[in-house]
């Protein structure tokens, strides 16, 4: 047998390693670069949009520049409520919406974010998505629409800004109220309010002109950025133990055109998923910090914070629970999502047998 010199062996070994590296998944991903256009629901000039821009920089960093995301604020390419179709048809590669916006066309999205008096803490929603099957339900439902649901993005509780004082449950009767739709709209409608769906950028002028009397839209920091304190001198919240009766965990998400997603090499898919999960908590923490800085500004602007009572919460709860079940029956994904959430709520003592009497899936 012919002997191979040490030098020749090392030379061949180097060639082999180089060849192996050249055909590794990461090297294949490096063979081309990808550029996505993603629009968020956050308006330019808000803390939310600033955080979104930082996320796009982080994606580039985590993918070594192989995936670049061009960020767009709300309305820059298409209207906020047109993002779904824009991503589906490829006008945009992806979106960062408030998930609940699609409840009218995908009822399950009403269960992919918090609803009146259901799960009310960010960690509970993380548990449901990542340990109780929620992420799988979301991805299967969105795949049928030609979309890939990457994951939820933690955000904030929602507060209501009002031009008139609302001091008890009965005061909602006749109020023209902007809400995000879905079950939340039905609960307020059952309480006697007249509900309207508007994107965030249209809330200020609607309040200013008196088109609406009050508006739910995210939390104090972004709402201050949008100038709500200038046109509405009341903020309506629940009691301390239930500060947001209607939407305590207002989740956003990242959704990508399914073909664009499938064209992305798996190593880059994994890094983007990791970036979204990381961003979820960075986004949440950034919003909370900004909220703490915003509250004193409301006081300086003369805005009064009104807290509803525990009795008001009980009245909303009596309206809300039957509406949960109504929405759960709208399609198979809604039923599957709510069934698992209901078991979770039972397990942590959030609902009683008495409250569920006569209701079934």
From Swiss-Prot:
Cellular component terms per the entry's GO annotation: periplasmic space; tripartite ATP-independent periplasmic transporter complex
Q: Which UniProt keywords apply?
A: Calcium, Metal-binding, Periplasm, Signal, Transport
Q: Name one GO biological process term.
A: transmembrane transport
Read off the InterPro entries from this record. DctP_fam, SBP_TakP-like, TAT_signal, TRAP_DctP_sf, TTHA0766
Q: Which GO terms describe its molecular function?
A: calcium ion binding; protein homodimerization activity; zinc ion binding
Query: Where mainly found?
Result: periplasm
- Residues engaged in binding Ca(2+): 158, 216-217, 247
- PROSITE patterns, alphabetized: TAT
Q: Where is the signal peptide?
A: 1-22
Q: Where does substrate bind?
A: 101, 158, 178, 217, 247-250
For this chain, the family text in UniProt reads: Belongs to the bacterial solute-binding protein 7 family.
Function according to Swiss-Prot or TrEMBL:
Part of the tripartite ATP-independent periplasmic (TRAP) transport system involved in the uptake of lactate. This protein specifically binds L-lactate.
Q: Which NCBIfam families match?
A: TRAP_S1 (NF037995)
Q: Quaternary structure?
A: Homodimer. The complex comprises the extracytoplasmic solute receptor protein TTHA0766, and the two putative transmembrane proteins TTHA0767 and TTHA0768.
Q: Supply the name of the protein.
A: Lactate-binding periplasmic protein TTHA0766
